[in-house]
Each structure stands twice: as structure tokens, then as C-alpha cells.
């Protein structure tokens, strides 16, 4: 059995044994430890409060040397989530130097990260977006220039997530 699958099984068991507020996780298919379905609960005191946003975590076979990819399958309007649902945060970027110079190496993926640290970073991103490098330029622009419209669009996403 691959080291990565053993590590993922341990991380899943740890999360089930000691759940963390704000999210839950499980396997999409019991026979595939590399594909997880997660539910991110909109953090209190944010525009996303009350939302139940589903996402997929796709782990590479060389995890934890390389980060997983995270994609929301629930619609979510946020500057750091592109229109296809892909999450763009530093710790999900491959380790090493950033060729564009936006991120320091220690901000990027490190093998010490776990599923829990990833999901806590996503919750932090929902609370405090990074406007320096938006994945959804339209959402970032709307939040800056027409906050009322931005709030309305996020509220629609929250409502839809409650109906899924």
C-alpha cells in the first residue's frame, strides 16, 4: 500500500474521531482514498454564514509531497474561487518559489499540511479574502466597487447551498 494512502486513511480517521467545527469530510467512493467530498459550513459573522458548500479534494499519488486540488461543486461567489469552483490559496500551490513573486515559499504547500489545515485555511479565506491575487477577478471587482451587489450574489449562493 502506498504511503500516501496510509497517511490519508489516518487523516480521515483523525477527522472522524475528533471533528473540527466548520467542516466535515468523507470519501466520494469508499474504494478511492484519493478523492474526498467535503462540506464547508459558512463561517459565522461572514456573508457565507448559514451556507453548506460542497467541494471535492483530489489528492495526488505523491501526497503529501504535492498538494491536493480543491474544487467547490456548490456555487460560491468569492474572489479566491474561480468561476469553475477551483480554490486558489497559497497552501494549495506547489512547493517552491513562486515564479510571479506573489508568495514566499513558506506560504505555499509544505508536506506538514493536513486536510484539517487545508480546510481551516479555506474557512479563513472565506472570512478574509486575498485581493492581491484573485482567481475570480469579477468577484473581487464587484466586492470593491459594488458591495451591495456582491452581498446579494453571495446571499443567493448561500440560499442555493441550503437547498442542495
From Swiss-Prot:
UniProt pathway annotation: Protein modification; protein ubiquitination
Listed GO MF terms: ATP binding; ubiquitin conjugating enzyme activity
UniProt keyword terms in alphabetical order: ATP-binding, Nucleotide-binding, Transferase, Ubl conjugation pathway
Active-site feature positions: 88
UniProt catalytic activity: S-ubiquitinyl-[E1 ubiquitin-activating enzyme]-L-cysteine + [E2 ubiquitin-conjugating enzyme]-L-cysteine = [E1 ubiquitin-activating enzyme]-L-cysteine + S-ubiquitinyl-[E2 ubiquitin-conjugating enzyme]-L-cysteine
Enzyme Commission number(s): 2.3.2.23
Presence of keyword Nucleotidyltransferase: no
The keyword Nucleotide-binding is assigned to this record: yes
Any one GO biological process: proteasome-mediated ubiquitin-dependent protein catabolic process
SUPFAM superfamilies in the cross-refs: UBC-like (SSF54495)
Classification via PROSITE patterns: UBC_1, UBC_2
Stored Pfam families: UQ_con
Similarity comment text for this entry: Belongs to the ubiquitin-conjugating enzyme family.
Function, in words: Catalyzes the covalent attachment of ubiquitin to other proteins.
Protein name: Probable ubiquitin-conjugating enzyme E2 7
Amino acid at each position: 500500500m502506498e504511503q500516501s494512502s496510509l497517511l490519508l486513511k489516518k487523516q480521515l480517521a483523525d477527522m472522524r474521531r475528533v471533528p473540527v467545527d466548520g467542516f466535515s469530510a468523507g470519501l466520494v467512493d469508499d474504494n478511492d482514498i484519493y478523492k474526498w467530498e467535503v462540506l464547508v459550513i459558512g463561517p459565522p459573522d461572514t456573508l457565507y454564514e448559514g451556507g453548506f458548500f460542497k467541494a471535492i479534494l483530489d489528492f495526488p499519488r505523491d501526497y503529501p509531497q504535492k498538494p491536493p486540488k480543491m474544487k467547490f461543486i456548490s456555487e460560491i461567489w468569492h474572489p479566491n474561487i474561480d468561476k469553475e469552483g477551483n480554490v486558489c490559496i497559497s497552501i494549495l500551490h506547489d512547493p517552491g518559489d513562486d515564479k510571479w513573486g506573489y508568495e514566499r515559499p513558506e506560504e505555499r504547500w509544505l508536506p506538514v499540511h493536513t486536510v484539517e489545515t487545508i480546510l481551516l485555511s479555506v474557512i479563513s479565506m472565506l472570512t478574509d479574502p486575498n485581493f492581491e491575487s484573485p482567481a475570480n477577478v469579477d468577484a473581487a471587482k464587484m466586492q470593491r466597487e459594488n458591495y451591495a451587489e456582491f452581498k446579494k450574489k453571495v446571499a443567493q449562493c448561500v440560499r442555493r447551498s441550503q437547498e442542495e
